[in-house]
Amino acid sequence: MSSDIQQIRIGLTNNHPCSYLADRMERVAVAIDPQMQTPETYEVLMANGFRRSGDTIYKPHCDHCQSCQALRIPAPDFVPSKSQKRLLKLLSQEFHWQLKPELDEDWYALYARYIFARHRHGSMYPPNKMEFAKFARAKWLNTQYLHLYQGEKLVAIAVTDLLPNSASAFYTFYDPDISISLGTLAVLCQLNYCQQTKKQWLYLGYQIDECPAMNYKVRFNPHQRLVNQRWRG
């Protein structure tokens, strides 16, 4: 970290029930200096375990839990597994993707179906256009929407932050009625983008081993986890 970033002011939230582990309490550290809100600085902060929600930059700071570990993939070194190779073959045959600065007009119907089917008991329920916009956008970042199509049909959107030397998989939603792993396919598209544009890293957010819904992340290899402020893997 640079000396400027070492001196950032941090605010701590109160403890509240964890969104992922039912028996835990969570608390986050929030970077409260507006000058931290630049793509270059945020990229350094991500390398030190921070993420964003809207314009807010934060990092888990729980009293008795270290389960959240930032995870990233070195894009040039990625080697797909057998199942990922099958998805890549499908991608070349049936699907195509496109990065766009704005959402397609029919995005909300897809998003609402996804939330109703997969996250009815989560913090995003009930789906709301304005709340999603506040959550997904940051005024100071180049955020793009990776649209995944099956033929002409929109089947997934991956909100993707573009940084100078990396990309960040921020949030993905998809058609809940399609049986193939659209979430994994979206990450493969993001890795494809990183390789095309010679970006070093794709950040996948936090990995929590006790949370089965997150286990898809560790299937991308090689990957690194931030453990005790050191990237390992």
Swiss-Prot record:
Q: Does the keyword Cytoplasm apply?
A: yes
Q: Which UniProt keywords apply?
A: Acyltransferase, Cytoplasm, Transferase
Q: Which reaction does it catalyse?
A: N-terminal L-glutamyl-[protein] + L-leucyl-tRNA(Leu) = N-terminal L-leucyl-L-glutamyl-[protein] + tRNA(Leu) + H(+); N-terminal L-aspartyl-[protein] + L-leucyl-tRNA(Leu) = N-terminal L-leucyl-L-aspartyl-[protein] + tRNA(Leu) + H(+)
Name the Gene Ontology biological process terms: ubiquitin-dependent protein catabolic process via the N-end rule pathway
Q: Gene Ontology terms, cellular component aspect?
A: cytoplasm
Domain of life (superkingdom): Bacteria
Q: What is its main location?
A: cytoplasm
Q: Listed disulfide bonds for this chain?
A: none
User: Does the UniProt entry include the keyword Transferase?
Assistant: yes
User: Which Gene Ontology molecular-function terms are recorded?
Assistant: arginyl-tRNA--protein transferase activity; leucyl-tRNA--protein transferase activity
Instruction: Name the InterPro entries for this protein.
Output: Acyl_CoA_acyltransferase, Asp_Glu_LeuTrfase, N-end_Aminoacyl_Trfase, N-end_Aminoacyl_Trfase_C, N-end_Aminoacyl_Trfase_N
Enzyme Commission (EC) number: 2.3.2.29
Q: Per its UniProt entry, what is the enzyme's top EC class, as one word? A: transferase
Q: State where the protein is found.
A: Cytoplasm
What job does this protein perform?
Functions in the N-end rule pathway of protein degradation where it conjugates Leu from its aminoacyl-tRNA to the N-termini of proteins containing an N-terminal aspartate or glutamate.
Tell me its family: Belongs to the R-transferase family. Bpt subfamily.
- In Swiss-Prot or TrEMBL terms, this protein is called Aspartate/glutamate leucyltransferase
Which source organism?
Vibrio cholerae serotype O1 (strain ATCC 39541 / Classical Ogawa 395 / O395)
